[in-house]
């Protein structure tokens, strides 16, 4: 390890030379209070910025152990430190001049959700803080401008580090509130199954967002108020008593007129699998961590998935116990999404009729009379929903506005009226008595087969030059194969997409052997992430600055949408 004086001397030596001479700076340098590491140097000023990290020892940082002793506390603190550093870095961005990306200083941009990221990591055993950033090394044309880089590394970065990574320079009360909030959120999530609940929405929550693509709360948005019949009161470790709507396990139907807040409530529940920052409005909207949003995905590929619970006796004679297609219909794709969700270990489905295949969701009495059951290969979801709960322990929340077919089987019915929820279970059930109930198959479906084994791909073995590119939250490309993720609505951040790409790449190189099934492979990936770190999947210090931990459900979904993956299904 070299000293900061040696780095300054090195910069002076390479000043005004060709840009490739910046490669000489790669290495570690001891600065007062931290170690600066230049991990990867960009090829030219117009390329992706250089990767730089700082390591502050726990003793120097001085954070009390109770702020990072548990996982939820540590993630909350990491998130806050990253936000603090990012705000400081924005003040200095591009103050160092030059061509291309010269002078850029950036870290991961955190949204409303609190995610575990590779950009800031605290070691629980000693409190050491590792923060990764990207810096555009300055140049005039393609000639090194070392004096401008000196400003960044010796003035701007030290100020950001001292202002955001040293406990003595931060608001201790604010940090305590952030960690307390995380502990309260985690307490609610653990309390849900004990109370027979699958979700909780606190009174006073603000669910509407600022506008369509914004995730920030709407100003003057109507505060949520639970119906009295559904109110639950919890005693939180820090906030104390909190009251809100408890969504009970089973089948819950959300109804109401258009634009009255049905989908807004469902969207809040979708993202309630993550903790949210203070002031978001959804801090105390907590959903079962395994919840999966279901929808139709016309055109997606399906490989060796047992969809016989919903689809059988196809006219072309295709086997639905090991179904394959490169271009699924809406109903077929939604059936596959249900089975894959079960395989991924979900305990809760979230469904909006607006994004569902109608023929998958319901089949009314008139249609059943005209097209007899034996002529219809699709068993609609309404005929399996009770079975999913009683035999698999999977609760379902459905948003519906056009059909009352689910009134008969719902355990709880909530009407959204101008963003205010009302319990209309008794009223709706009484009205439903005047309408015929949809028949349910006498025999439950056979348990789906999940023993899908990926075949190894020789192109990945021993190959360290596998290219990967992400396109926001939409997709990830591995070599020339694009994995379409745009319909996975619970992906909260593009950095989770990057992590999913690395999960697939790591599995192809190290885990897929033609023997392990998909469940075992995802188990091992989670083990690597939990016991080592997400950065371990990269196998390189130059690519670990922009990932966020994805859920198990999205890891499965990514493999399921990877068209280049070849699966074999073994039956006992």
What are these regions, as identified by a protein language model?
Residues 341-385, 389, 402-408, 412-429:
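Conserved P-loop NTPase nucleotide-binding/switch module
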Residues 193-197, 203, 259, 266-297, ...:
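Carboxylate/His-rich catalytic cores and anion/metal-binding grooves
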Residues 329-341:
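Conserved alpha-helical scaffold flanking the Walker A/P-loop in AAA+ ATPase domains
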